[in-house]
Amino acid sequence: IKITTMLAKLGKVLAHV
């Protein structure tokens, strides 16, 4: 797993909320 992917996923989740 890449850290960038994790950050991107977290950012998307945060943006969604």
Swiss-Prot record:
Tissue: Expressed by the venom gland.
Cell compartments where the protein resides: Secreted
Keyword Ribonucleoprotein: no
Keywords attached to this entry: Amidation, G-protein coupled receptor impairing toxin, Mast cell degranulation, Secreted, Toxin
Pfam families named among the record's database cross-references: Bombolitin
Chain positions with Valine amide modification: V17
Gene Ontology molecular-function annotations: toxin activity
Main location: secreted
InterPro entries: Bombolitin
Cellular compartments per GO CC: extracellular region
Function text: Mast cell degranulating peptide. Its mast cell degranulation activity may be related to the activation of G-protein coupled receptors in mast cells as well as interaction with other proteins located in cell endosomal membranes in the mast cells.
Membership in a protein family: Belongs to the MCD family. Bombolitin subfamily.
Protein name (record): Bombolitin-1
